[in-house]
């Protein structure tokens, strides 16, 4: 029992010293996401007649939580919902679409001034939704956080996630968002 207490004490001490100088950020945001994908119906003959294209233009609501360390290392988790029309170009069908998008991002934050942060992040992303069922990809994120005081500011972010989907083959999801940001 004493070993567990000592281990927990040292684990808390090490973690608290690791994250001693950091910013925890919370950022709800709204934006736009464009998702496209294509599926080759006949892999033996990949002509343009054998390819289904899917395009979705969606409104987007997202919530972001992250840690920005004093040395610039950044870890961000974000999750959002998108809804809007989707188009299947071969049959020219318009269908409703909705997606859940989640990303885990690591990278670096440049701090040119005390209240201006520029993020360059990458990681792993997942999209679940209708009519495209699943996308697993690698997002690239560029963000600008401009704080007006010690605790609040403006978040402007663009993310592009290229990946492999099911039932689609290659997929791409581009998102632009804006919203308030809070620094704890």
Task: Name each region found by the language model.
Residues 1-25:
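Cleavable N-terminal export/targeting peptides
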Residues 7-8, 28, 150, 159:
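Short helix-onset patch at the extreme N-terminus, typifying the N->h transition
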Residues 20-70, 74, 173-184:
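Short glycine/proline- and aromatic-enriched beta-strand/turn motifs that initiate or cap beta-hairpins
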Residues 25-33, 76-84, 119-125, 155-161, ...:
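Transmembrane beta-strands of outer-membrane beta-barrel proteins
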Residues 31, 99-105, 117, 159, ...:
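Detector for outer-membrane/organellar transmembrane beta-barrel domains
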Residues 38-47, 87-95, 131-138, 156, ...:
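Outer-membrane beta-barrel translocator domains and adjoining extracellular loop/strand segments
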Residues 59-138, 146-150, 182-184:
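Gram-negative (and chloroplast) outer-membrane scaffold detector with strong preference
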């Amino acid at each position: 029992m004493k070993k567990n207490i000592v281990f927990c004490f040292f684990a808390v001490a090490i973690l608290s010293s690791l994250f001693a100088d950091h910013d925890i950020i919370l950022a709800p945001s709204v934006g736009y996401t464009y998702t496209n994908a294509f599926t080759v119906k006949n892999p033996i003959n990949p002509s343009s007649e054998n390819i289904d294209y899917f395009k979705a233009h969606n409104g987007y609501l997202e919530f972001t939580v992250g840690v920005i360390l004093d040395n610039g290392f950044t870890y961000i988790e974000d999750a959002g919902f998108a809804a809007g029309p989707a188009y299947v170009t071969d049959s020219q069908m318009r269908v409703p679409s909705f997606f859940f998008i989640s990303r885990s991002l690591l990278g670096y934050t440049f701090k040119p001034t005390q209240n201006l942060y520029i993020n360059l992040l990458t990681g792993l992303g997942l999209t679940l939704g209708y009519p495209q069922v699943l996308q697993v990809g690698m997002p690239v994120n560029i963000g600008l956080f401009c704080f007006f005081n010690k605790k609040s500011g403006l978040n402007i972010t663009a993310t592009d996630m290229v990946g492999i989907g099911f039932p689609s083959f290659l997929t791409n999801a581009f998102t632009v968002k804006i919203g308030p940001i809070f620094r704890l």
